[in-house]
Amino acid sequence: MHPDVSADLAELDATLKTVESVLDIEELRRRIDELEHQAADPDLWNDQDHAQRVTSELSHAQGELRRVEDLRRRLEDLPVLYELAEGEEGEARTAALEEADAERAALHSDVEAMEVRTLLSGEYDKREALVNIRSGAGGVDAADWAEMLMRMYIRWADRHGYPVEVYDTSYAEEAGIKSATFAVKTPYAYGTLSVEMGTHRLVRISPFDNQGRRQTSFAEVEVLPVVETTDHIEVPETEIRVDVYRSSGPGGQSVNTTDSAVRITHIPTGIVVTCQNEKSQLQNKISAMRVLQAKLLERKRQEERAEMDALKTNEGASWGNQMRSYVLHPYQMVKDLRTNYEVNNPSAVLNGDIDGFIESGIRWRMRESQAS
């Protein structure tokens, strides 16, 4: 085996050992055994929220273990591939070496992706995520763009097998949505998706413009950690106003004959949340309260960061203003304005292929944190 290949495999092995150490594989196996025991309990589903947390954590832990074990197996197979290739002659040798090199490159990419997971060590990174998307400047194009972003994130979750629960969708009059709120219900969803916070910009020929002019649209993405009991986010009934109304669909059309949709106003802060996607008023109120608690937790975190001078002007601009540009005309490119990571296939990105952006964003966040 060529010395450069041997050195590269040694580097891969060292990186993978770091990943295995950070994830604590033996502890992961122990936790899986514990969760499997809980999942087998016939009384588990007496508490549906707890049951969903158990099954979600179990599925995530099993997936993590499978990924690491698969990476280790592939790394152990690589020297064999090179040995077999070097035993060939002529064109067969060339083809076999190219195959081994391709697998080594693919393994590099997969190990680096797994390494990114070890960077999620923030206080709330392990939580499930609440994602809020709001249309911005750009009229009907912005509403359509907000719906495209919602579809992008849901397809990303589907690619990974992450459950998604849509809490609320406020449809625009002509097309698209004014806003939407949904939960990505898997461990580390918040740590992963929080790098997507900010303003997303779309440039394209407007399908709603009879003259076929180019239009720039904006939509805002907010990502919040799901609140847990340990956060002690109490919301007294005296601090909220609850309004009920009929659920509506595209174009404002009523889709329910009963007042099942719920709007909750938090009187001290003025925060308003709505939920209309559940079947009953009670279910919608429970979901809306979860969103309100998440927003209050984020408000509390912002106040704490402000006190610690963590929300400096440069960081605030990074997250609050444009963070990614999607250009469909006159050329095709999606570019992250913080990391400079870019791809020339917007169609794939809008269909949920955003792992490259997320991974580069997590690394960027780590560098920014270390520099501050």
From Swiss-Prot:
InterPro entries: PCRF, Pep_chain_release_fac_I, Pep_chain_release_fac_I_sf, PrfB. It is found in: Cytoplasm. The keyword Cell wall biogenesis/degradation does not apply. The modification N5-methylglutamine is found at Q253. One of its GO terms (cellular component) is cytoplasm. Methylated by PrmC. Methylation increases the termination efficiency of RF2. Coiled coil: none annotated. It holds the Pfam family RF-1. One of its GO terms (molecular function) is translation release factor activity, codon specific. It comes from the Bacteria. Keywords: Cytoplasm, Methylation, Protein biosynthesis. Peptide chain release factor 2 directs the termination of translation in response to the peptide chain termination codons UGA and UAA. Belongs to the prokaryotic/mitochondrial release factor family. This is Peptide chain release factor 2. It comes from Nocardia farcinica (strain IFM 10152). The lineage of its organism: Bacteria, Bacillati, Actinomycetota, Actinomycetes, Mycobacteriales. The gene is prfB.
